[in-house]
Regions:
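Long, contiguous bundles of hydrophobic transmembrane helices that form the permeation core
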Residues: 1-17, 40-47, 199-308, 428, ...
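Alpha-helical transmembrane segments and their helix-start/interface "positive-inside/aromatic belt" motifs
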Residues: 6-22, 153-165, 255-258, 310-319, ...
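Core transmembrane alpha-helical segments of multi-pass membrane transporters/permeases
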Residues: 14-23, 48-103, 278-341
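Hydrophobic core segments of alpha-helical transmembrane domains in multi-pass membrane transport
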Residues: 15-31, 86-94, 127-131, 173, ...
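Membrane-interfacial loop-to-helix junctions in multi-pass transporters
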Residues: 77-83, 110-123, 155-161, 256, ...
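Hydrophobic alpha-helical transmembrane segments of multi-pass integral membrane proteins
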Residues: 87, 116-147, 323-328, 333, ...
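Alpha-helical transmembrane segments and, especially, the helix-loop junctions at the ends
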Residues: 91-92, 129-145, 153-202, 213-218, ...
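Membrane-interface alpha-helices at helix entry/exit sites of multi-pass transporters
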Residues: 107, 116-123, 157-165, 196-200, ...
Length: 463
């Protein structure tokens, strides 16, 4: 009698993982008591802040299990701006990619770096960290992911490496937050500190994080280059847009014109983000314009441009749905009025910790809070009015409490399925979340350990 072979464990689809998290959140509405903080609008900044010591219980309003599908719909609707932006990015980049200009450029670059291919990793990380620590760019840099992937594949690396050197560069820069108005700027304002003060220590943190992240990605890339089967995405069929069997060594005049349009477009994008306060609406308009112009330059008719755009948008629809479904967790916790209770409970953990480890505890608790309040600005508005009094009582500087917030908010965004920026990167790159997590978890643990050391260092130097 033949024995049946054991079925190999397969990681569930990202939809399944998110639905499990949603069910846990729904169950929590029956267990966690409802409560809320009193909020007020700060006249000086116009921001809605939490009043310290104002938490109070209110009547429970647990979620009816039959309304979970409706909550998913609400999560998708509330993510509409992000989803629309991603669909437009997917469509526009498909038009641009189909011209062959991007492939030709990356092939030229790969030849330039062929003898020093691993140098590309720290160079890209550093470049995109600048976008992160100056303009607070995170989800916005997903537009550069196809370039990183194409270059990485030409260098004999994998899509994960190409995605990581773009996404993690922005993540490191955003977290270090030298001049980031969305985490450090908001938190320091609430903590009544001089804007962007404490710069020197944040520069040190940036350098250490860039070095650690570069070393980790290079080690992974070397392993994949030597043994392709060790790639975390080995065995997954390659996407058609990242196959280069017909790539040539020459760049046509039309392709050069497309690259010029792209360069001008990215220049306008950076100007708009830094000087005009652009967001998804303006960026979407720019990329529609770029895609159409590049299509016409390449000799495409309107119908060909439309077909390519549709194919590109279709290719990332699953990733777009993931972003909306992930938003459902926040919708459930907020509607049931248990979000503030969870934050209140986590902050109280810091209060009962020994003074010697309170700084590290503040960082770890901010990381936990980021699981339910993924928005950096939103997290600052809720937690900083609570953490500042705690730090004042135990003799920890307000600058250190801001540091705890920025590290706690920044690191976990690269692993949480609720992070719209992470899901955006993965949607564009078509890397399954489970595979990314396998690659990212060791680095996340390294970041967390470094975060604890940064907090201890802040205490030692009197930051």
């Amino acid at each position: 009698m033949e024995t049946k072979a054991k079925k190999k464990w397969k990681t569930p689809h990202t939809f399944v993982i998110l639905v499990v998290i949603i069910l846990i959140a729904a169950a929590a509405t029956y267990i966690v008591p409802a409560g809320e903080f009193t909020r007020f609008k700060d006249a000086a900044t116009g921001k809605t802040l939490v009043e310290a010591g104002s938490y109070h219980r209110i009547a429970s309003s647990p979620l009816n299990p039959l309304k979970i599908p409706s909550a998913i719909y609400t999560g998708i609707v509330k993510s509409a701006s992000t989803i629309t932006f991603m669909l437009i990015i997917g469509g526009a980049f498909q038009v641009i990619t189909s011209t062959g200009a991007l492939t030709a450029l990356c092939k030229k670059l790969s030849k330039t770096f062929s003898k020093h291919k691993y140098v590309v990793i720290p160079v890209f990380l550093t470049l995109f960290s600048i976008f992160g620590f100056t303009m607070g760019m995170s989800s916005e840099v997903m537009i550069f992911v196809p370039i990183g992937i194409t270059l990485a594949l030409f260098l004999g690396l994998d899509k994960v490496t190409g995605t990581a050197m773009i996404a993690l560069g922005a993540a490191v820069g955003f977290t270090a937050g030298l001049l980031n108005p969305f985490n450090v700027g908001v938190a320091q304002d609430i903590a009544e500190l001089q804007l962007f003060s404490g710069m020197a220590y944040r520069v040190f943190i940036l350098v250490v994080l860039l070095a650690a992240t570069s070393a980790y990605i290079i080690c992974y890339a070397r392993k994949v280059a030597a043994h392709p089967e060790k790639s975390v995405i080995y065995g997954i069929p390659e996407d058609q847009e990242y196959t280069f069997d017909n790539a040539t060594d020459t760049i046509t005049v039309r392709q050069i014109a497309v690259l010029i349009v792209m360069a001008l477009g990215f220049g306008i994008l950076i100007y708009g983000l830094s000087k005009k306060g652009w967001y998804f609406e303006e960026m979407s308009g720019l990329f529609i314009f770029m895609g159409v112009i590049c299509g016409f330059i390449s000799g495409y008719g309107p119908s060909r441009i439309a077909r390519e755009f549709g194919e590109g948008a279709k290719g990332i629809i699953v990733g777009c749905l993931i972003i909306g479904i992930a938003r459902t967790v926040e919708v459930i916790l907020s509607d049931a009025n248990i979000l503030d209770t969870i934050v209140y409970g986590i902050v109280n953990i810091v209060n009962v910790m020994p003074d010697s480890i309170k700084a590290v505890g503040m960082f770890l608790c901010q990381s936990l809070i980021n699981c339910v309040i993924v928005s950096g600005t939103g997290q600052a508005a809720v937690t900083m009015p609570l953490m500042v009094p705690v730090s004042d009582l135990v003799g920890i500087s307000r600058q250190t409490s801001v540091l705890a917030f920025q590290l706690g908010d920044g690191f976990s965004n690269s692993v949480l399925p609720m992070s719209s920026s992470l899901m955006g990167y993965l949607a564009v790159s078509k890397i399954p979340y489970s595979k990314w997590l396998k690659f990212m978890m060791p680095l996340f643990l390294i970041w967390t350990a470094l975060g604890c050391l940064f907090m201890l260092g802040a205490l030692i130097i009197g930051y």
